[in-house]
């Protein structure tokens, strides 16, 4: 169930945004507006956050806990592509490529994430072409790396 973000969490997200390369092209006001549109959600171990092939609707910032990303190889094999913990973003690549999810992401332990909806992210990209261009470049590099696994 979705919950509102409290003051302490807002400050934590703001600090993460300041340190993440992906948000350096945004003004303070743009970063704060993004945070105001986010919400908090909790997951239990083995909860599937999204599956490879799903349409993207949100990206996630891990506050507590860990996730594991896997990619299908052939029909029955799965390859672990990443394990992410607090302060990590995931799911944003699909916003830029307009393609389905490229991996399945599952909670490895009890976790809390902050969620940013695709509609909010797209609104920001339309207002900031330089940021959009930079993110597309970053996304292309990540996609090449992922497809080589």
PLM features per residue range, with description:
Residues 1-149:
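Cytosolic regulatory regions built on CNB/CRP/Popeye-like sensor folds
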């Amino acid at each position: 169930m979705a919950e509102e973000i409290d003051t302490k969490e807002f400050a934590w997200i703001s600090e993460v945004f300041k340190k993440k390369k992906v948000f350096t092209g945004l003004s303070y006001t743009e970063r704060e507006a993004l945070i105001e549109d986010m919400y908090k959600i909790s997951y239990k171990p083995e909860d599937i956050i999204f599956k490879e092939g799903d349409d993207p609707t949100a990206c996630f910032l891990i506050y507590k806990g860990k996730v594991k990303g896997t990619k299908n190889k052939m029909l029955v094999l799965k390859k672990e592509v990443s394990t992410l913990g607090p302060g990590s973003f995931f799911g944003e690549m699909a916003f830029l490529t307009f393609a389905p999810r490229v991996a399945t992401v599952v909670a490895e332990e009890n976790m809390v994430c902050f969620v940013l909806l695709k509609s909010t992210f797209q609104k920001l990209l339309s207002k900031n072409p330089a940021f959009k261009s930079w993110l597309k470049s970053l996304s292309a590099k990540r996609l090449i790396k992922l497809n080589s696994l």
